[in-house]
Amino acid sequence: KIFLIEFQKTSIDEPHIQELTPEIINSFSQKKEHTILLDRIGNANNLGAIVRSAAFFGIKNIVIPKDESQTSITTSSYRVAEGGMEFVQIYSTSSVLSLLKSVKGKMVRIGTDLNASKNVSVIHDLCTKKPALIILGNEENGISESVRANCDELVIIPFFGMKKGKASPVESLNVAQAATVILYELQKGNQAF
């Protein structure tokens, strides 16, 4: 027997990526909206998974740099987001450093770093008066040195049994997995139950 399988071509409209303006940046802090900044995330599936986690945890804003090392929204990232693209606005910026400088004092700029001394569990307490700008770095290199230098706080997700001088069985979590842990810690004090 021969079975014929017909594949239906489906097209997904690319979500509008809005250019970040000073007015939009000010609205993040005025509305006390936590925001995610991606620093050169190269994998479209990771972008989609981060969008899905952001939507799940009520984060409405994600900023991506206009940089060729930063992935944009693809059909793959849209599918991985599983509906999250409808709840999250993606913005683009031509300068990550300008964004970090413009939110100084208005938002808590929190970077992720394998050498950080603060546990991610403190993240909610860091953001009781100002919203967070969570910075997630490239899959291989993390956040850049210039971004790290412009963070108010650096946090680490500790591995099981973490002790000074003890190596992790794996270097780190995937950036999308790390985003989920960070957003959970950020929002855990805001649960309605």
Can you name each region flagged by the protein language model?
Residues 3-117:
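RNA substrate-binding interface of SAM-dependent RNA methyltransferases
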Residues 39, 46, 139, 152, ...:
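Acidic active-site catalytic centers that drive phospho-/nucleotidyl reactions
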Residues 76-84, 145-193:
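Structured adenosyl-cofactor binding patch, chiefly the S-adenosyl-L-methionine
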Residues 100-104, 124-127, 187:
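Surface-exposed amphipathic alpha-helices with a cationic face
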Residues 109-171:
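Active-site/ligand-binding-proximal alpha/beta "capping" segment
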